[in-house]
Each structure stands twice: as C-alpha cells, then as structure tokens.
Regions:
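Short pre-catalytic strand/loop immediately N-terminal to key active-site residues, enriched for Gly-Thr
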Residues: 39-53
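Conserved phosphate/ATP/ADP-binding segment of small-molecule kinases
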Residues: 1-40
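Charged C-terminal helix
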Residues: 74-114
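Short, small-residue alpha-helix embedded
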Residues: 51-73
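Glycine-rich beta-alpha junction loops
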Residues: 20-24, 46-49, 81-85
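Generic structural signal for well-ordered, non-membrane alpha-helical segments
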Residues: 1, 5, 52, 73, ...
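Phosphate-handling active-site elements
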Residues: 39-40, 66-80
C-alpha cells in the first residue's frame, strides 16, 4: 500500500488518502501520504461488524473540514476515522430499519468540539 500511494502521489503531484485499510480483522482505518513531507501515516478504529452506505461521504466531509480548519492530513484522517466510526456505531442498533446511510448527526458534537 505504501508504494501504491507514493506512486499515486508522484503521478498526481498530490497527497493521498486511502480509506478502508485493514491489517487486522477487527480494525479498519485510513492511510495518508503527505507528499510535501514525504510521510505515511495510519489511523485505525475498531471495525463495526456491519456495513452502511454513505460512510465515505462522512469520512470525506470530516476530513476536508478538518484540513480547511488547519489540521494536518494525518490529524484530519484521525478525526475523520473517529467521526465515521461514531456515526456507524450509533447507527448499528438500527441496522435492520436504517440501511441507506448512517446517523452522522449523532456524532456532529465530536466535530464541533475540536
């Protein structure tokens, strides 16, 4: 993965964020490659044993919001992973009735308290 994101960064002249990274069955997270600093970072949360649509949108929104607010890519990935995890975890009890997205609103206070 590290070679892949570095090559992608070189090909696009941009930093790279890769989500859905997992090396352990019970963990899920993201990898960031900061092209300017030539650094690779990982951040993981517990994997919630279910799947919902819209988690990529939640991650991207939280990530870019954090970057705009001045956080580094590594810090933004951590924030986005934690926010997405909270949204999924809060939606898990309703998975039989709520399959089309996550209750991200329940995790917004995490972002507003940064």
């Amino acid at each position: 993965l590290e070679q892949l994101v570095k090559k992608l960064g070189e090909a696009t002249s941009a930093s790279v964020v890769l989500t859905g990274v997992s090396f352990q069955e019970d963990k899920l997270g993201a990898l960031t490659y900061d092209k300017d600093k030539n650094t690779i970072s990982y951040f993981f949360t517990d994997r919630v044993p279910t799947m919902f649509h819209g988690t990529g949108d939640c991650f991207a929104s939280a990530f870019f919001g954090a970057v705009v607010k001045g956080y580094s890519y590594q810090e933004a990935a951590k924030i986005a992973c934690e926010f997405t995890y909270m949204a999924v975890k809060n939606t898990e009890p309703f998975q039989d009735k709520h399959w089309y997205g996550v209750y991200f609103e329940s995790a917004l206070s995490y972002l507003t308290n940064l």
